[in-house]
Amino acid sequence: MRRSAVAVLAAGLFFTGAGSAVADAWRNMPTLKSTGVKLTKGKYRMYPKFTKHGGFGFKANLVDDEHGDGHNVYVQARVEGYSWRRFNGQQKKTVRIQKEVYDGAALYVSNAYIRACRDRGSLRPDNCTRTLHYTRR
């Protein structure tokens, strides 16, 4: 009797953990494109509390789409109530970026935003893709 109760309890814990892992799996992100910059093969996830600060994680290829323009590219990401964090790419290259953005004062974040931009210098404004908004499910 006791062994079967332990077996049932262990199976329940196993399937609960498997369900949590699926709920926090990586999800696909659409390709973002603007003049001179692309963010491709993107995936994101909202980490559960106590895992990577309960933050927003993303991984994608940041592509300098116009090699001859002499401008750098970068990704910006932010979570609710905070300013944009900038992650630089390289000119004339494709760079794989994997980062986490989080609120250090909270157990987890509920809203996250991401976009890719081309740095056109100080005299002209940068051009950015549309901003994607993700919420915790």
Question: PLM features: residue spans?
Answer:
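Secretory targeting and sorting signals
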Residues: 1-23
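Post-signal peptide N-terminal regions of Sec-secreted extracellular proteins
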Residues: 23-137
